[in-house]
Amino acid sequence: MMTNFPWLTTIILFPIVASLLLPIIPDKDGKTVRWYSLIVGLIDFAIIIAAFCTGYDVNNPELQLVESYPWVPQLDLNWSVGADGLSMPLIILTGFITTLAIMAAWPVSFKPKLFYFLMLAMYGGQIAVFAVQDMLLFFLVWELELVPVYLILSIWGGKRRLYAATKFILYTAGGSLFILIAALTMAFYGDTVSFDMRTIALKDYAFNLQLLLYAAFLIAYAVKLPIFPLHTWLPDAHGEATAPAHMLLAGILLKMGGYALLRMNAGMLPDAHAVFAPVLVILGVVNIVYAALTSFAQRNLKRKIAYSSISHMGFVLIGMASFTDIGLSGAVLQMISHGLIGASLFFLVGATYDRTHTLILDEMGGVGQKMKKVFAMWTTCSMASLALPGMSGFVAEVMVFIGFATSDAYSSTFKVLVIFLSAVGVILTPIYLLSMLREILYGPENKKLVEHEVLKDAEPREVFIIGCLLVPIIGIGLYPKIVTQIYDATTVQLTARLRDSVPVLMGPEKVALTDVSELPTRAPEIK
């Protein structure tokens, strides 16, 4: 077992270094660059799997594969990386989705070297976000990750690409200022100056300061997840992005917000989390219902799926605020599940647009008659999105519902209301998804569209990509332990720590978190 091998550093730096070689590769038509990038992606994903198999213990809740190299010793600033149950499944997801996104980018012919350079740089940057254990380093990789996304949106996007890219960078960069302010405050608080996340988490912050820090982080990560009302950049970004960018936005970037909420808000500020938990639940319900209703009203296919993503992220908020093992486990599983399902749907949006050259549902209709493979893929992936039993979304949402329903941190009235409203959102999901399928595939034929000579069925590359995404979607739905065992040890430990901060009185006089006036002015110390 190669426990001393720098697995995570290699995984992060390999695609970045490989991207620097792209400008010197002789290539006229882009074919060499495509294959080179795909091979780099496959090798890096293989290294991720090797690291998981040889150096990661699923029963250990602590950080593993830890590396730490001095950077600025005077400030205890290090290149520090590690992986636990919160980060390892998302690192694997990143490698998987990004490699498929590189394959999805096969039709890109405009400036292919620059495009694949940005894709590979983003590959390493995304994994760095999930692996780094230094607050300042986290802020740096969080910011650097924005640059490739902005360039891909602004260069290869649609007609309103500059507007969408500018809105994306303004929202996300503005939110990042709150990360920097909170990180510096935590690092310089107390007698020791340190940016190490584990050291920062052990500091005894004043309770009111915890609340301010939690609010700052929440604003920053609410943009990325996204959470209403800081979500408006996402439909615009998806509306102008290409298929590979779609896959990375839905599959990876949104999960960065959920991961950071768990890692920093819940993990480092558990006392404040106990106070903000009802707010997260309410925001989660708003996300589910509002986005589902808005998605139903959309006539643009990309924007419809984008609002669907926002709706599904609401379950992540409810699960992480449930204070139960199964609820928190469901939140993590929902992030993984939606990463796969969202990537598949947006890839199909791109494949459909390449053939029909329209995103307006009113201009579609009857395309399933000529594209039977596309018809089958759209139907299957939509069933996964509406949480059909036997698929990953069903398991994740049921776990969140059960976790919240069995939580003793909330009053019965509040739980019933939340579950009822969330169920309304769940019911709305098949309504807008099935109506979408009808308008694309089953509706009256658009003669100009159906008779168009380029309206060809899915090619083997497209079938392969969707097949690769459906295998884990169905696999998790049938046997969720294949994924939950990776993170269960960590989420159980985190839940126990969070419950220590919940002012619950055992017996008939227990305090519900929905009554904030009954919370103590200072939460109990973490044992």
Curated annotation (Swiss-Prot):
This protein's UniProt keywords: Membrane, NAD, NADP, Plastoquinone, Quinone, Thylakoid, Translocase, Transmembrane, Transmembrane helix
Catalysed reactions, as listed in the record: a plastoquinone + NADH + (n+1) H(+)(in) = a plastoquinol + NAD(+) + n H(+)(out); a plastoquinone + NADPH + (n+1) H(+)(in) = a plastoquinol + NADP(+) + n H(+)(out)
EC identifiers of the protein: 7.1.1.-
Pfam families reported in the protein's UniProt record: Proton_antipo_M
Membrane topology field: Multi-pass membrane protein
UniProt entry tagged with the keyword tRNA processing: no
Entry keyword Metal-binding: no
GO cellular component: plasma membrane-derived thylakoid membrane
GO biological process: ATP synthesis coupled electron transport; electron transport coupled proton transport
InterPro entries recorded: NADH_Q_OxRdtase_chain4, NADH_Q_OxRdtase_chainM/4, NADH_UbQ_OxRdtase, ND/Mrp_TM
Subcellular location: Cellular thylakoid membrane
MF-aspect GO terms: NADH dehydrogenase (ubiquinone) activity; ubiquinone binding
EC category: translocase
Highest taxon, organism lineage: Bacteria
Segments passing through the bilayer: 5-25, 35-55, 90-110, 112-132, 136-156, 168-188, 211-231, 242-262, 274-294, 310-330, 331-351, 386-406, 416-436, 463-483
Family according to the record: Belongs to the complex I subunit 4 family.
Functional note: NDH-1 shuttles electrons from NAD(P)H, via FMN and iron-sulfur (Fe-S) centers, to quinones in the respiratory chain. The immediate electron acceptor for the enzyme in this species is believed to be plastoquinone. Couples the redox reaction to proton translocation (for every two electrons transferred, four hydrogen ions are translocated across the cytoplasmic membrane), and thus conserves the redox energy in a proton gradient.
Name used for this protein in its record: NAD(P)H-quinone oxidoreductase chain 4 1
Organism whose genome encodes this protein: Trichodesmium erythraeum (strain IMS101)
High-level lineage: Bacteria, Bacillati, Cyanobacteriota, Cyanophyceae, Oscillatoriophycideae
